[in-house]
Amino acid sequence: MSQAAETLDGWYSLHLFYAVDWASLRLVPKDERDALVTEFQSFLENTATVRSSKSGDQAIYNITGQKADLLLWFLRPEMKSLNHIENEFNKLRIADFLIPTYSYVSVIELSNYLAGKSDEDPYENPHIKARLYPELPHSDYICFYPMNKRRNETYNWYMLTMEERQKLMYDHGMIGRKYAGKIKQFITGSVGFDDFEWGVTLFSDDVLQFKKIVYEMRFDETTARYGEFGSFFVGHIINTNEFNQFFAIS
């Protein structure tokens, strides 16, 4: 049996995607619509307080295209905290006008493919802690997609030796390093949590960088032979103080 990669796991992650039911929302009187938007704003401003205590983080983006209108991404120390957030969100009046289109449950993950040998406790390493328990950037754009490592009769990632996988992941990582300063990447593991094995969340102030890195990695052996991908979601940041304009209907 091939040796399994060890992982370091950080905050639990929940991506929630919604489409706005504009037709129904249009029937709501303006004063009532303003009230439910204000309630939504207050909810998200309250959940965002974890950032200052370094006990979680969140991001809100307006998704481009018809897959969704809004992405709410929450990071928390415990899975049950994500349940609480989702349950409380569903009780908001605005939730009656937001149609769930997709969700993804995972946990911030670092693998040991590229790690050197050390007796140090990795969870005490400041660099590693910053990656496992991150402060999310307020970049203009976000890109999210789920992925698997292929396992079929021809190409099976899980039948490769540890040394083979380490070599492939090293080459793969070298491409990613070319985009340092342009893209911020977060990998979340989801084996046993969701339908794919990993979620990839990218941040950048230049949306074109998403296309460039994904295209370049198509030629990398790790992706070309072993990568399988779900849907891609791309969007622009939206702040809670922009909600009145976003939900405004003339």
Swiss-Prot record:
Keyword Lipoprotein: no
EC number annotated for this UniProt entry: 1.3.98.5
Cofactor(s) this protein cannot do without: Fe-coproporphyrin III
NCBIfam families: PRK12276.1
Pathway, per record: Porphyrin-containing compound metabolism; protoheme biosynthesis
Keyword Metal-binding tagged: yes
PANTHER family to which the protein is assigned, alphabetical: COPROHEME DECARBOXYLASE (PTHR36843:SF1), HEME-DEPENDENT PEROXIDASE YWFI-RELATED (PTHR36843)
Disulphide-bridged cysteine pairs: none
Catalytic activities: Fe-coproporphyrin III + 2 H2O2 + 2 H(+) = heme b + 2 CO2 + 4 H2O; Fe-coproporphyrin III + H2O2 + H(+) = harderoheme III + CO2 + 2 H2O; harderoheme III + H2O2 + H(+) = heme b + CO2 + 2 H2O
UniProt remark on cofactor binding: Fe-coproporphyrin III acts both as a substrate and a redox cofactor.
Tree of life domain: Bacteria
Active site (record annotation): 145
Residue intervals passing through the bilayer: none
Keywords: Heme, Heme biosynthesis, Iron, Metal-binding, Oxidoreductase
Example GO BP: heme B biosynthetic process
Pfam families registered for this protein in UniProt: Chlor_dismutase
Natural source organism: Staphylococcus aureus (strain MRSA252)
MF terms (GO), sorted A to Z: heme binding; metal ion binding; oxidoreductase activity, acting on the CH-CH group of donors, oxygen as acceptor; peroxidase activity
Similarity comment: family membership: Belongs to the ChdC family. Type 1 subfamily.
Protein name (Swiss-Prot/TrEMBL): Coproheme decarboxylase
Binding site for Fe-coproporphyrin III: 131, 145-149, 172, 185
Functional summary from the UniProt entry: Involved in coproporphyrin-dependent heme b biosynthesis. Catalyzes the decarboxylation of Fe-coproporphyrin III (coproheme) to heme b (protoheme IX), the last step of the pathway. The reaction occurs in a stepwise manner with a three-propionate intermediate.
